[in-house]
């Protein structure tokens, strides 16, 4: 049982003190969802092994009354298993599979393109002692030896291409307050973590001012006394479109179902064209 209702969390921070890791972000939300206070152990990309006493080279890591738990997904499952009397993060194995699908979809749709658009900002905002490591590791492991500067260059042409790909996500949130239904759950926290990561490094906004995602994002950032409102975060909204850029989202003119079509409420839903009388010979 968590001593004094507090669980220790090893963070991954930028120079501003803002959390950068989406995995740490969703663990922060998971702990708050369960009603725990969080004892943050600060730190950046380097020195994780030393901070965790040789237990891990990656974060998040939590310590619950002496019990060490690694990996954000494992941590969430651990919290539900150990504290079933508190609000649940998951509701059964089927929901877990759907969450994993959404998580993978967001990473391929948004995180991948945005990573390349903000990779130099990512480096510049890191702790000074981390920057050599960030440059070397990202250039060698993720960018095939390309320089950060070369990869980020031209992002003004690429940023407008991402918002239209998020339309399926907008359609879901147009039908429900939270991904978890009436209340948020780990699906919301995992998805919010993508945008929290983006806000930590995005010196140029990735979304337009009028993006319908704003409502869900604002409510999500405000959860748990403004957990997502760190002064080191950058604005997500304010992307300026140029002539020829694609429309950032579909502007709904009426109620829509999950597939973007009008809800079927009976024969009156389908408006058939008037029948034209055939001319007599």
From Swiss-Prot:
Coiled-coil parts of chain: none
Put simply, this protein is called Beta-etherase
- Give the function comment from the record: Able to degrade various dimeric lignin compounds. Catalyzes the unique and reductive cleavage of arylglycerol-beta-aryl ether.
Return the similarity comment: Belongs to the GST superfamily.
Q: Work out whether the entry's keyword set contains Cell membrane.
A: yes
Q: Name one Pfam family in it.
A: GST_C_7
What processes does the entry annotate via GO biological process terms? Answer: lignin catabolic process
Q: How does the protein associate with the membrane?
A: Peripheral membrane protein
**Primary location group:** membrane
Which GO terms fall under molecular function for this chain's record?
hydrolase activity
**Taxonomy-wise, where does this protein's organism fall, top ranks first?**
Bacteria, Pseudomonadati, Pseudomonadota, Alphaproteobacteria, Sphingomonadales
Q: Which CDD domains match?
A: GST_C_etherase_LigE (cd03202)
Give the residue ranges for region: Disordered: 244-281
A GO term from the CC aspect: plasma membrane
Can you give the residue ranges of the GST N-terminal domain? 11-87
């Amino acid at each position: 049982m968590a001593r004094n209702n507090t669980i220790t969390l090893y963070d991954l921070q930028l120079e501003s003190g803002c959390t950068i890791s989406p995995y740490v972000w969703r663990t922060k939300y998971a702990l708050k969802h369960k009603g725990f206070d969080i004892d943050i152990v600060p730190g950046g990309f380097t020195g994780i092994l030393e901070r965790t006493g040789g237990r891990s080279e990656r974060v998040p890591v939590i310590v619950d009354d002496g019990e060490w738990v690694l990996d954000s997904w494992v941590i969430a499952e651990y919290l539900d298993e150990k504290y079933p009397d508190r609000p649940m993060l998951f509701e059964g194995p089927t929901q877990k599979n759907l969450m994993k699908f959404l998580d993978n979809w967001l990473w391929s749709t948004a995180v991948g393109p945005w990573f390349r658009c903000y990779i130099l900002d990512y480096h510049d905002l890191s702790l000074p002692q981390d920057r050599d490591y960030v440059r070397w590791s990202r250039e060698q492991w993720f960018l095939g030896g390309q320089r950060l500067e070369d990869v980020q260059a031209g992002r003004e042409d690429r940023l407008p291409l991402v918002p239209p790909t998020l339309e399926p996500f907008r359609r879901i949130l147009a039908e429900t307050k939270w991904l978890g239904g009436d209340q948020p759950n780990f699906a919301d926290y995992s998805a919010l973590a993508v945008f929290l990561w983006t806000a930590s490094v995005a010196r140029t906004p990735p979304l337009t001012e009028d993006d319908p995602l704003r409502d869900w994002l604002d409510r999500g950032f405000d959860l748990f006394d403004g957990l997502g409102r760190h002064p080191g975060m950058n604005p997500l909204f304010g992307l300026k479109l140029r002539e020829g850029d694609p429309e950032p989202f579909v502007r709904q003119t009426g109620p829509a179902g999950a597939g973007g079509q009008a809800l079927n409420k009976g024969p009156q839903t389908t408006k058939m064209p008037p029948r034209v009388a055939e001319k007599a010979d």
